[in-house]
Swiss-Prot record:
Keywords: Cytoplasm, DNA damage, DNA recombination, DNA repair, DNA-binding, Endonuclease, Hydrolase, Magnesium, Metal-binding, Nuclease. It is found in: Cytoplasm. The keyword Magnesium applies. The active site is at D7, E67, D139. SUPFAM superfamilies: Ribonuclease H-like (SSF53098). Mg(2+) 2 binds at E67. Homodimer which binds Holliday junction (HJ) DNA. The HJ becomes 2-fold symmetrical on binding to RuvC with unstacked arms; it has a different conformation from HJ DNA in complex with RuvA. In the full resolvosome a probable DNA-RuvA(4)-RuvB(12)-RuvC(2) complex forms which resolves the HJ. It comes from Bordetella parapertussis (strain 12822 / ATCC BAA-587 / NCTC 13253). The gene is ruvC. This is Crossover junction endodeoxyribonuclease RuvC. Belongs to the RuvC family.
Length: 182
């Protein structure tokens, strides 16, 4: 399974692509989309949209994983980050990719083992897990960590969803004497 991970941001959007076969991970590509701050908001969102479309076209992922926006102390920053995230979601939808979303806590826990890990710890574990020669840049490392999180957690969630659906299908409501039972 090829996973495209995205760490959305209005100034810098990180992306990382890995191949996952069971627990084996292989690095494919990563980078940071740097958006010129002089552009208007719509132009900045278009830069993110166009670049992520291109990344998806070139790397041909099977699935995408995206970090969920956290609530910042500054509501305006949170709204702007949400718009960058929206541009990323549009690019992924346009590329017909299934999108899975994870919180920063879930990503850090899946990659480092603790949800309170520092950025440097995430970078170091990404480097180790993917056998990289150097430490990836922070935005790329976060995106690769998101992809790694999905590679480790996503298949389990898929199985649980299928089991939940099967359990729901197997438990049809029953009627006895015109009343609902069980």
């Amino acid at each position: 399974m090829r996973v495209l991970g995205i760490d959305p941001g209005l100034r810098r959007t990180g992306f990382g692509v890995i191949d996952a076969e069971g627990m084996r991970l292989r690095y494919v590509a990563s980078g940071t989309i740097v958006v010129p701050p002089a552009l208007s908001l719509p132009e900045r969102l278009k830069v993110i949209l166009d670049n992520l479309r291109e990344v998806a076209r070139e790397t041909r992922p099977d699935v995408a994983a995206l970090e969920i926006v956290f609530l910042n102390t500054n509501p305006a920053s949170t709204l702007l980050l949400g718009q960058a995230r929206g541009a990323a979601l549009c690019a992924l939808a346009d590329s017909a990719l299934d999108v899975h979303e994870y919180t920063a806590l879930q990503i850090k826990k899946a990659v480092v083992g603790t949800g309170r890990a520092a950025k440097e710890q995430v970078q170091m574990m990404v480097q180790r897990l993917l056998s990289l020669d150097g430490t990836p840049a922070p935005d790329s490392a976060d995106a690769l960590a998101c992809a790694i999180c999905h590679a480790h957690v996503g298949p389990l969630h898929d199985r649980l969803d299928r089991l939940g659906t099967a359990a729901q299908l197997g438990s049809r409501p029953r009627l006895r004497n015109g009343r609902l039972v069980g």
